[in-house]
Amino acid sequence: MDSVLTNKNPIIYPKRTRRYRTDQSSTDEFSSTNRIRDIKDPEHPELSLEDLNVLTEESVEVDDHKSYVRITFTPTLPHCHLPTHIGLCILVKLVQSLPARFKVDVRVAPGSHDKETTVNKQLGDKERVTAALENPELVALLNKMMQVC
């Protein structure tokens, strides 16, 4: 990863109060958001994607009956150089934590990144995702992003 920061002074948003529930039988926006809210930003590992407003509860769509989850994330800058890493991390975290029946779709929010189409194409290509996950350095970074302090 580059040692040069693209976003030296990111805006930090207040976290929403963490909510818990006792019924864990269904997968919905609430449970899916809780699965990914603590993913760390690759450029600022002391901050979560939620802290930077890259992920919000509103960016999570779930259809339990159709076994479908869509996450739309917003990079902090239109020229952010790590949106693919962020998207891959979200994808991996959800695939690892959701029941196997779910199809997971991760996308950059429309108009939020200069290379939105390219990033979305990469994240939607199973062969590219599989190839990326064979890179030990990238896997190490993704694991670091998913670590909960």
From Swiss-Prot:
Pfam families recorded: FeS_assembly_P
A biological process term (GO) from this entry: protein maturation
InterPro entries: FSCA_dom_sf, MIP18, MIP18-like
SUPFAM superfamilies hit by this protein: Fe-S cluster assembly (FSCA) domain-like
UniProt key word Repeat: no
Keywords assigned by UniProt, alphabetized: Chromosome partition
Coiled-coil regions, chain positions: none
Annotated PANTHER family: CYTOSOLIC IRON-SULFUR ASSEMBLY COMPONENT 2B-RELATED (PTHR12377), PROTEIN AE7-LIKE 2 (PTHR12377:SF7)
Protein family: Belongs to the MIP18 family.
Function: May play a role in chromosome segregation through establishment of sister chromatid cohesion. Unable to complement ae7 mutants, and thus probably not involved in the cytosolic iron-sulfur assembly (CIA) pathway.
Protein name as catalogued: Protein AE7-like 2
Source organism per UniProt: Arabidopsis thaliana (Mouse-ear cress)
